[in-house]
Regions:
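Alpha-helical cap/lid subdomain in secreted, periplasmic
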Residues: 119-173
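N-terminal secretory targeting modules
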Residues: 1-69, 77-81, 96-100, 130-131
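Short catalytic helix/loop segments, enriched in acidic residues and glycine
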Residues: 84-97
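A short beta-strand-loop structural module common to alpha/beta enzyme folds
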Residues: 99-113
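Solvent-exposed loop/turn segments at secondary-structure junctions
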Residues: 75-76, 111-114, 141-144
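Short, solvent-exposed loop/turn segments at secondary-structure boundaries
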Residues: 78-83, 116, 147-151
Length: 173
């Protein structure tokens, strides 16, 4: 996958997912959490492949509108029965069926906090071949689990809203 595009290279350079302490503890107690956790790395690798395909298409003669997805496991589709059943894939299929095909560039990462989106995911938008038509950002659950102190969480999400491209769709918990 390396060598195709700066975004693809950045995704390939990410270290493997490491579960948070709470996730590790819950996985010891729950087979369901253990099995969902086992899908995280394969799902992320599949998104990387799809991003590479979308960027290759976007750099060709046909330039479909770009939909960039940022965020955490909700944007990855973790917990769905397959990558095709996550909300991003389902909405992408519905748009395609309605005659509005988009190239998806899913830069999300399971376990991401709002600061990860700001510091790691948003800067990758500078490497898109052209401006995204849609940017969706779904994050907040991991922020809440890590530090539920409301004023701090509110400041983080306000900072994210300020850093996001104009017209982004931000969904948080």
């Amino acid at each position: 996958m390396s060598g195709h595009h700066p975004i693809v290279d950045a995704l390939a350079a990410r270290p493997p997912w490491e579960p948070a302490r709470l996730t590790r503890a819950l996985a010891r107690l729950s087979g369901t959490i253990r099995s969902v956790s086992a899908t995280i790395d394969p799902t992320e690798r599949r998104w990387h492949e799809l991003v590479a395909q979308s960027l290759a298409t976007a750099e060709g003669d046909h330039r479909p509108p770009l939909w960039v997805v940022l965020g955490d496991s909700t944007a990855q589709g973790i917990g769905a029965s397959s990558i095709d059943h996550g909300w991003v894939s389902r909405l992408h299929a519905a748009l395609h069926d309605a005659g509005r095909p988009y190239a998806i560039v899913n830069l999300s990462r399971s376990g991401a906090h709002s600061t990860h989106v700001i510091d790691e995911q948003l800067p990758l938008l500078d490497h898109l071949p052209y401006a995204a038509s849609i940017v969706t950002i779904c994050v907040g659950g991991n922020d809440l689990v890590a530090n539920p102190y409301a004023p701090r969480l509110t400041r983080r999400l306000e900072r994210l809203a300020e850093a996001a491209p104009r017209g982004s769709i931000l969904c948080t918990l």
